[in-house]
Amino acid sequence: MDNRPIGFLDSGVGGLTVVRELMRQLPHEEIVYIGDSARAPYGPRPAEQIREYTWQLVNFLLTKDVKMIVIACNTATAVVWEEIKAQLDIPVLGVILPGASAAIKSSQGGKIGVIGTPMTVQSDIYRKKIHDLDPDLQVESLACPKFAPLVESGALSTSVTKKVVYETLRPLVGKVDSLILGCTHYPLLRPIIQNVMGPKVQLIDSGAECVRDISVLLNYFEINRGRDAGPLHHRFYTTASSQSFAQIGEEWLEKEIHVEHVEL
């Protein structure tokens, strides 16, 4: 038993899609979240800069005495997860392998699509992980550089957003039976993405799949929070506007949250 919180980091608000799933599946666990919205999106940035920024977020979470860190950002997972996992003495999870595994299970025709930031797609990490598990599957990857900025701006269902999503995803329509949402921002656009891709395409939320792995590790290391540990005190931090973060966060999590601005 370990009553310390679980730490989450992301380039912005996208990681809240993972937090929402954790609140649903593991409602007794406490959360500390840091979103680097001031420097979002990470996708177009060079790998070394992503590495530097991600380590800053990790070190911030370590000051909060977290028992586990979840890199709730596909771009950061692709660039630096292995390094962070090797250097810390607490469990560190990324969101890519769970998403790849879930896509393999859900694919009926062996044609998997991956959408993500330019860096995630350029790294080719989803294709590599999928082919490690099943080399016979076809994988089509597509960079969607405009999606995360739309989510960060709060434009989740405007006509402009619908047009951007349609025009961006058009090359994949009719070509895949499963689609990995390879950025934790993208589930906030899920209804629009599903509408464009069609009802038969299975959308895979890599962040939500990650929560199953969180549960497994909590049990394996015996670090679940005690049921009688007292009231939860979730803490949310952002490097940008706390008001903007709270507005998106409360809409997505369907509860009031307190958000604090921090400088890194």
Curated annotation (Swiss-Prot):
Keywords from the named record: Cell shape, Cell wall biogenesis/degradation, Isomerase, Peptidoglycan synthesis
Residues holding substrate: 10-11, 42-43, 74-75, 184-185
Residues of the active site: 73, 183
Record-level Gene Ontology MF annotations: glutamate racemase activity
Known catalytic reactions: L-glutamate = D-glutamate
Biological process, per Gene Ontology: cell wall organization; peptidoglycan biosynthetic process; regulation of cell shape
Enzyme Commission (EC) number: 5.1.1.3
Highest taxon above the source species: Bacteria
Pathway annotation: Cell wall biogenesis; peptidoglycan biosynthesis
Pfam families, alphabetized: Asp_Glu_race (PF01177)
Family: Belongs to the aspartate/glutamate racemases family.
Functional summary from the UniProt entry: Provides the (R)-glutamate required for cell wall biosynthesis.
Protein name: Glutamate racemase
